[in-house]
């Protein structure tokens, strides 16, 4: 049943079944506990695979019909008001909010929101602040950054966030992210940075592609 769910690209079911194998040592555990279904955005745009998979795993457990008590919808659990802002379409915050259950639209807007947050002067491409803003909101990130005394220590910053929900969210999504990076044989520069007491800067797959292309020309 577990292998069938994995092969049939049923990530939500595979993840639930895979959680039963935590102590079994099964070779299937990585692919079921950390599913990696194909991701396609509405406009066919490039998605930052490992980061989006990490967010989806925590937000919706790969259930495209997930809806939170606060009203967040879809794979990436986008709030209708946020989706309307990102899409510049107020209808998504109102009568058309259920369109957010469309996986391709949800992924498209989720990726755009990631890009918006990464470009925010308060975040500056930092993974800790990005995930804090994603879960707690940019306004709370700004407030907590002013009030929390962390002496520029990234781990102290996370542990000092007043919201327990946001602290746990950041820790779990980062864990997911690094596991997906390992699974896909990707560098772990952000994890190494945290180990050295540095802020983990996020480099998107698009930025990596540019760097590789530039290295090839040199």
Question: Can you say where each PLM-predicted feature lies in the sequence?
Answer:
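Catalytic glycan-binding domains that act on GlcNAc-containing polysaccharides
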Residues: 1-218
